[in-house]
Design a protein with these regions (language model features):
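A structural signal for isolated positions on well-ordered beta-strands in alpha/beta enzyme cores
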Residues: 1, 45-47, 86, 125, ...
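N-terminal glycine-rich phosphate-binding loop and ensuing alpha1 helix
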Residues: 1-58, 69, 138
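Short glycine-enriched, charge-decorated loop/helix-capping segments at active-site entrances
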Residues: 16-22, 92-94, 218-219
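Structural signal for short hydrophobic segments within the conserved structured cores
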Residues: 23, 86, 250-252
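Conserved phosphate-coordination/catalytic loops
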Residues: 25, 94-102, 223-227
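Conserved beta-loop-beta/alpha segment of the NTase-like Rossmann-fold superfamily
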Residues: 64-168, 173, 212
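Catalytic-core segments of class I nucleotidyltransferases/pyrophosphorylases
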Residues: 115-116, 124-125, 132, 137-148, ...
Length: 272
């Protein structure tokens, strides 16, 4: 699920006429970087939620996103070149965005459709349409590892940027036995001195996190209930059901005109 429903208040006046995920970053709409990464990973379908200026997003990408032929021939032969897009139009249906958990609950029937014999898909990626993370790999191996465990969510954390020096979540003892060091995500008390990291907005989620007892919103969110994601995550963390790992690649929360300007001025190889 690609989150694209926010108003982008801090990005005004740019977002008065353009939804933040469509603002240009290094020659293409910001959310196109995520669509390309998903397509390169072989993800076949993405749900995009919209609210503020949502019709512009649907008009930009329509129902199918195809990779441009800029990749070399070997890459083109090894990846899926198109991505089916479904839209969850929160603004059209309810007049405003439903926040992250409310939006995911609204999109859940699209995210986890029946797979046959009454079964439903269990896990899905969630990522924001307003972060720049050009090197992230939506790894099928990460999905398989997540499916094999019992966690409700797995988060990618990043070092704290200047605008979020306090961070969001802690990271428990890291297991280095596998190919990627993984630990428990921690909901640390305010006085806890252990380091916190910033949630990158990229994560793997299990459908069960958005169902009772964790979430009381009905699948499809027919009443348009607004609900943030953080309380669900913190409750699951307190019960040991959220894992995390550190991501060290390029990552920018493109939240203000100044950050957008800096990103477009810096050379592509630079760490913003």
């Amino acid at each position: 699920m690609l989150l694209a429903a926010g108003r982008g208040e801090r990005m005004r006046p740019l977002t008065d006429t353009t939804p933040k995920p469509l603002l240009p970053v290094r020659g293409k709409p910001l959310m196109q970087w995520q669509l390309e990464a998903l397509a390169r990973a072989g993800v076949g379908r993405v749900v995009v939620n919209t609210a503020w200026l949502g019709p512009q997003i649907a008009a930009q990408f329509n129902d199918v996103f195809r990779l441009q032929p800029a990749l070399n021939k070997h890459e083109q032969l090894s990846i899926q070149d198109s991505l089916q897009i479904r839209y969850s139009h929160e603004g059209q249906d309810f007049g405003a965005a439903l926040e992250t958990a409310g939006g995911i609950a609204r999109a859940l029937p699209l995210l986890c459709p029946p797979t046959g014999a009454g079964a439903r898909a269990e896990v899905f990626w969630v990522l924001a349409g307003d972060v720049y993370v050009p090197d992230f790999v939506f790894s099928p191996a990460a999905v398989a590892r997540f499916l094999a465990g019992d966690k409700l969510a797995h988060l990618w954390l990043v070092p704290n940027p200047a605008h979020n020096l306090r961070g969001d979540f802690g990271l428990g003892t890291v297991d280095t036995g596998g190919p990627t060091p993984i630990g428990l995500a921690l909901n640390l008390p305010a006085a806890d001195p252990r380091p916190r990291y910033t949630y990158s907005t990229i994560g793997l989620y299990r459908r069960a996190l958005f169902e009772p007892p964790w979430c009381d919103i009905a699948a499809g969110n027919p009443l348009g209930i607004k609900a943030p994601l953080a309380p669900l995550l913190r409750a699951a963390m307190d019960n040991g059901f959220v894992s995390a790992e550190l991501y060290g690649g390029r990552w920018t929360d493109v939240g203000t005109p100044e950050r957008l300007r800096a990103l477009n001025l810096n050379p592509p190889s630079a760490q913003p």
